Amino acid sequence: MRTTYMAKPGEVERKWYVIDATGVSLGRLSSEVASILRGKNKPQFTPHIDTGDFVIIINAGKIGLTGKKATDKIYYRHSQYPGGLKSRTAGEMRTNNPEKLLELSIKGMLPKNSLGRQLFKKLHVYGGSEHEHAAQQPEVYELRG
């Protein structure tokens, strides 16, 4: 009888990918990146082991938002003090803090447990075209579709 292969944490090979977010839809990019971070594009994917790769996203400020999301999609946060509810539209976040916009979108697509927090640490988002990971020799990743 054969048993299902399960990857061990020590035998996983990790690559570094760099993705240019210029003009790409936020949701399409986020779902692809979440899949890479989890390792679902690898044949040795194991749900409870971190088999994913590192991802660098550049030009986050040039991400595309379809429809009226720039004005109608609202992100809320609360300071836990009375009257401390603050809100921002997706368009404001894209201009003021584009890294946070992408991170929130990708984080929502990862597991909500300790593995998800570990996977999220492998994501590096930059608003401009420069990044500080040249020593890792990242490959350019072409998005599907």
Curated annotation (Swiss-Prot):
* Database matches in CDD domains: Ribosomal_L13 (cd00392)
Q: Which BP terms does GO give this entry? A: negative regulation of translation; translation
A Gene Ontology cellular-component term: cytosolic large ribosomal subunit
Q: Which Pfam families match?
A: Ribosomal_L13
In the record, which residues are listed under signal peptide?
A: none
- Which keywords describe this protein according to UniProt? Ribonucleoprotein, Ribosomal protein
- Keyword tRNA processing on this protein? no
- Keyword Nucleotide-binding recorded: no
Q: Which GO terms describe its molecular function?
A: mRNA binding; structural constituent of ribosome
Q: What InterPro entries does this protein's entry cite?
A: Ribosomal_uL13, Ribosomal_uL13_bac-type, Ribosomal_uL13_CS, Ribosomal_uL13_sf
Superkingdom is Bacteria
The free-text function statement in the UniProt record for this protein reads: This protein is one of the early assembly proteins of the 50S ribosomal subunit, although it is not seen to bind rRNA by itself. It is important during the early stages of 50S assembly.
Subunit composition and interactions: Part of the 50S ribosomal subunit.
Q: Which family does it belong to?
A: Belongs to the universal ribosomal protein uL13 family.
Q: What's the protein name?
A: Large ribosomal subunit protein uL13
Name the gene for this chain.
rplM
